[in-house]
Amino acid sequence: MKKIVYLSGGIGGAKLAKGFYNLNDIDLTIIVNTGDDENIHGVRLSPDIDSVIYALAGIEGQFGWGQKNDTFSVNEEYKKYIPQEFNLGDKDLALNLFRNQLFSEGKSLTQITNIITDKFDLNCKILPMSNNVVSTKIKTSNGKLLDFQEYFVELKS
């Protein structure tokens, strides 16, 4: 059995992880970017970890993020209270609420990712690049410092 350790980030990284996952006779460990993790609407999101899990489970959304056949009922209702650009599906929200519950119990992101990987019955190890918060920041030409999700999603940059 060959051991493969793969560093993954973004939607493209999740697609390549799926390719490795589908190889025969390998022991796969995927170390996933957490620089895009962020709190949105009071919920801590780990989008790159989720994209890898969804891709390996075969349930990734058509654009490579979120879950296929997801609904956005909570998101639409929430827009009545707070204007927003970020769309989080109901199934995706459920996973992130579960992650937040585990954080509130004192578990680390590594422990939480292992639990979620087991829930999806995946036969590999998925690890966050860090248990600490490491944020990707973008400094604009006018000097404003933005979180990655704000830059990428809200400004559509």
Ranges and model annotations:
Residues 12-17:
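Short glycine/serine/threonine-rich phosphate/pyrophosphate-binding segments
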Residues 9:
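Thiamine diphosphate
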Residues 24-29:
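A generic structural motif
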Residues 33-157:
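Electropositive, gly/pro-rich neighborhoods at or near active sites that engage anionic ligands
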Residues 20-23, 46-47:
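Short, solvent-exposed amphipathic alpha-helical segments in soluble enzyme
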Residues 1-5:
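Extreme N-terminal starter segment of soluble prokaryotic enzymes
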